[in-house]
Amino acid sequence: MNQPIAAIGISDSTRPKTNVRLTISAEHLMDTDVFSKSDPICLVYEKTSGKKATTTEPVQVPTWQDSQWTERGRTEVVMNNLNPQFTKTFLLPYFFEETQLLRFEIYDADSPNVGQDLSPHDFLGRFECVLAQIVSYSTLKAHLGKAEGIGAQWRNKDKNTRTGSITIRAEEDEKCEKIQFDVCGEGLDKKDFFGKSDPYLNFKRKFDDGSAHLVHRTEVKQKTLDPRWATVQINTQTLCGKDGERPIIIECYDHDKWKKGEEPRGEAKFSRDDHIGTAHTTLNELLRGGAGDPVELLLTNEKKKAKKGDKYKCSGTLKIWNSKIIVEPTFLDFISGGTQLEFAVAVDFTASNGAPKNSSSLHYMSADRPNQYELALRSVLSICQHYNSSKTFEAFGFGAKLPNSVSVSAIFSLDLLRGTPEVVGISGVMSAYRHALQNVQLYGPTNFAPIIDTVAQKAQNMIHDSARYQILLIITDGIISDMHATIRSIINASGLPLSIIIIGVGNEDFEKMHELDSDDSLLQQDSRIAQRDIVQFVTIREFLNNGRGVYLDPDVVQENLAREVLFEVPGQLTGYMKQRGFQPRPVENPWTRNSPPPDYDPVLDGIGRRAQAPSPGFQMPVASAPPMY
C-alpha cells in the first residue's frame, strides 16, 4: 500500500489546506440615504488572535472591536441598492483543525472610495461565524446584527428584519487533482551481498532554488530486481505545482532492515539505505504513459557512473503506464453534501489520576485554570461541533466504580443523572464530566477495548452510505492494560467509518502508545493487518508550555492541540469513502441535517456571545448570538 510521507509536527507549509472562495450578497438592507438608496460595501475580517494571518494591515474599526480582528478584504461599492450582489469574491485558506472566526460588516459608503477610516460611512450591520459553519452548509444566510450585535443565523420560519440579511456562499476553489499510474522496475542493480535488493521509490518535487522535497514514497518490495509497485497516486499540486514541465525527481533505494528492537521511528529508519539510481522526469512526460507504450526512465547512479566511465550504462529502468489525471471527492464535497461527523468521548477515571480533591490530581478542578482533561475535551469538541448539526455528543467514562456499585465499570455513561451517553453541546459534556467526578470512585484498570468496541458497533450502522462518519476521542493518563485486546479492536474497526483520537495527559511514559498510531506502517497483530490507519495519538504535555517552563494560555494550548490531533481526520474520512466507493451527495440535495434540541444554547459552547447594550445613538434592537443550526 502506498503511503504518503507522515507529517512530523505541523507547520503552515505541511498542514493539509484547501482554499475556499466566498461570494457575498445581502437583502433588505437599511436605507440611510435621504434622496436615494444606500450604497453598500462589505468588509471581511478574520479573528487572528494576534497572529499575522492576513494579507492586509488592520483597518480602523468601531471602538468596541478589539485589535485582534484583521481585514481580509472588501467588496466593491454597489450604488443605490438595498439588495446588493457583490461581484468581488474572497479566497480564504480553510483548515478543518482550526477555529477560523470571521466577521462580515456592511456599510453605506459615503463615497465610491472607502478608505481606512470608516467613521464617515453609516454602519448597516454585521454577522460573525466560523468558516466551518459556512462550508458545512455551502450557503449560509443570517440576520445582520446592529450596534454590538453579531447577527443570527437564518431559520426556515424567520421573516425579514429592519437590519436586513446577509448570504455567504462557499465553494472549494480547486478540486483535488491527482496523477495516477502504474510503475515497475527492470534490471535494478543488486545492492545486497547475499541476496537481491529490497527496492522502493521516492518521488521529490524540485524547487526553483535547486532544493528538492520528498512528497511520496512507495512501499518496499522484498528481494527483487524487477519490482512492480502498487498503483501510485500523487496530488499534482504537491508534486509539481500543476506545472507540466517542472522537474520531478524519482529516486530508487534498497532498504536495509534493522535488527529487531533497534529500528528507529519515522524517517530515520530509511537513513542507511543504499542508493540504486535516480531518474528525472516531468508531469507531462509521466502522462504520456497513458497512451500506448509505457514511458521508460533510466536510473543513473552518479558515483557508479564516475567510477566506470564509458562502460556504465544505467542502474536499471523504470517503466510507467496507465497514467491519467483523476479528480477525487474532497472532504468539503462530503461536508457540503450533508455528511455529519458523529462524536463520542471517553474519559479515564482510573485511580492513577490521583484523588480529584488533591491539587496534584489530573482531575483537580481549579478555580482559575482548566485541568488537562478539560483542555483536551474543549480542544477537540470546539472544532468538531460545527460539523454536527444536532450538537449532540456521546460521553463515556471508564475505569471507575459507580455509586452503589461494588464492581468496576469498564464503560459507563458520563451523564449519571440520566444514565444515557447522549449529551447536548460541549457544555453538556463538561457538566456531565464534573458531576461524574464528584460521584464515582476512581479505580481501574485502563482498558480501551470495551469503549472502542461500543463505538465501533455504532459505526457499523453507518456503513451503508456517506451520511455519517464517527470520531472517538479517548483521554487517558497512562499505558493501557489491555494492549492486545485494544489492537484487536482497532484492527476490527479499521474498515468502519471511524477515526480514533487518543490524548495522553500527565507525565506518564507513553512510548508504547505510539504502537497504536501506525503512521509508518499499518497496525498488525499475528496475521491480521488493519485496512487503514484510524488512530492519532498525542500527549498534551507537549503543548502546555513554551519549552522554557512557562505555561501557555489555555486558549493557546487548545488551539495548538487541536491542530495536532485533528489534521488527519479529513484524509481519514475521504480515504474511507474512497475505499467504500461512496460519492458525496450534491449540494442541492444534501443529507438531512438534524436540528439541535430546543434547550441547546450556542453561547454556552463558545459560539458567538451574548448581545451587549447598544452604543449611544443606535435605535435598533441588538441581535442575540446566533443559534448555529
Curated annotation (Swiss-Prot):
Domain VWFA: 342-561
Residues given in the record as Ca(2+) 1 binding sites: 33, 39, 108, 110
Region (Disordered): 581-600, 607-629
Gene Ontology biological process terms, A to Z: cellular response to calcium ion; receptor localization to synapse
SUPFAM superfamilies xref list: C2 domain (Calcium/lipid-binding domain, CaLB), vWA-like
Pfam family, one: C2
Record bears the keyword Membrane: yes
Record: residues binding Ca(2+) 2: 33, 108, 110, 122
Cofactors required: Ca(2+)
MF term (GO), any: calcium-dependent phospholipid binding
Segments forming domain C2: 1-144, 162-299
Record GO cellular component, one term: plasma membrane
Primary localization class, coarse: membrane
CDD domains, sorted: C2A_Copine (cd04048), C2B_Copine (cd04047), vWA_copine_like (cd01459)
Residues at which Ca(2+) 3 binds: 192, 198, 254, 256
Keywords: Calcium, Cell membrane, Membrane, Metal-binding, Repeat
Localization of this protein: Cell membrane
Residues that hold Ca(2+) 4 according to the record: 192, 254, 256, 274
Function according to Swiss-Prot or TrEMBL: Exhibits calcium-dependent phospholipid binding properties. May function in membrane trafficking. Regulates synaptic levels of nicotinic acetylcholine receptor subunit lev-1 and unc-38 in the nerve cord. Involved in nicotinic acetylcholine receptor (nAChR)-mediated sensitivity to nicotine and levamisole. Affects directional sperm motility.
Domain notes: C2 domains are necessary for calcium-dependent cell membrane association. C2 domains are necessary for neuronal progenitor cell differentiation in a calcium-independent manner.
Family, per entry: Belongs to the copine family.
Assembly notes: Interacts with nicotinic acetylcholine receptor.
Official protein name in the record: Nicotinic receptor-associated protein 1
Species this protein is from: Caenorhabditis briggsae
Organism phylogeny: Eukaryota, Metazoa, Ecdysozoa, Nematoda, Chromadorea
